[in-house]
Amino acid sequence: MGAAGVLIGQGFDAHRFAPAGSGRELWIAGLYWPVPDSCSEADAARYEGIEGDSDGDVAAHALIDALLAAARLGDIGSLFGVGADAHGAGRHGIDMLQEVVAHLASNGYTPASASVAIIGNRPKIGTRRAEAEAALSAAVGCPVSVTATTTDHMGFTGRGEGIAAIANALVEKI
């Protein structure tokens, strides 16, 4: 551990978009992304949700892994399980983040700072960046910055098949 008792962790998550008509809601960075009123029926499919056991919120999930990694407490799968019957099944990323913060506290750690980079063509994160930062910061209890990028049409995110996120987090021993 560093002299100041600050530890860093990194997390990553990626999910495929659900097929059109699946009824899955699109949740990213703790926010629901509804189909815009001005959206054509053909474009509405681009707001289909993300496949996953929970809400598929890649930003929240990457942040969970970063926080747990920093405290050396495992990862999202070790805390919430995997599969339809797991502890995390059907849950929202924000709820899971709040549980992780409580788990950190019970193990003597507190979040100090975090950053999440969302990788994908859609939705356009910049339009709601401040809202996303506020939602994640409130859930974690420390400042969380949110950035977004594309892969210039390369790979599964570039082809619009899915979305990914990378997060870094600092935790302090309390």
Swiss-Prot record:
Site (described: Transition state stabilizer): 53, 150
InterPro entries to which the protein is assigned, alphabetical: MECDP_synthase (IPR003526), MECDP_synthase_CS (IPR020555), MECDP_synthase_sf (IPR036571)
Cofactor: how and how many bound: Binds 1 divalent metal cation per subunit.
Reactions catalysed, as given in the entry: 4-CDP-2-C-methyl-D-erythritol 2-phosphate = 2-C-methyl-D-erythritol 2,4-cyclic diphosphate + CMP
Keyword Transmembrane: no
Residue positions binding a divalent metal cation: 13, 15, 61
Cofactor(s) this protein requires: a divalent metal cation
GO biological process: isopentenyl diphosphate biosynthetic process, methylerythritol 4-phosphate pathway; terpenoid biosynthetic process
PROSITE patterns reported in the protein's UniProt record: ISPF (PS01350)
UniProt binding sites for 4-CDP-2-C-methyl-D-erythritol 2-phosphate: 13-15, 75-77, 149-152, 156, 159
EC identifiers of the protein: 4.6.1.12
Keywords, sorted A to Z: Isoprene biosynthesis, Lyase, Metal-binding
Cystine pairings recorded for this chain: none
Gene Ontology MF annotations: 2-C-methyl-D-erythritol 2,4-cyclodiphosphate synthase activity; metal ion binding
Keyword Phosphoprotein included in the entry's annotation: no
Pathway assigned to this chain's UniProt record: Isoprenoid biosynthesis; isopentenyl diphosphate biosynthesis via DXP pathway; isopentenyl diphosphate from 1-deoxy-D-xylulose 5-phosphate: step 4/6
Family under the similarity heading: Belongs to the IspF family.
Known role: Involved in the biosynthesis of isopentenyl diphosphate (IPP) and dimethylallyl diphosphate (DMAPP), two major building blocks of isoprenoid compounds. Catalyzes the conversion of 4-diphosphocytidyl-2-C-methyl-D-erythritol 2-phosphate (CDP-ME2P) to 2-C-methyl-D-erythritol 2,4-cyclodiphosphate (ME-CPP) with a corresponding release of cytidine 5-monophosphate (CMP).
Quaternary structure annotation from Swiss-Prot or TrEMBL: Homotrimer.
The protein, known as: 2-C-methyl-D-erythritol 2,4-cyclodiphosphate synthase
Provenance organism: Bifidobacterium longum subsp. infantis (strain ATCC 15697 / DSM 20088 / JCM 1222 / NCTC 11817 / S12)
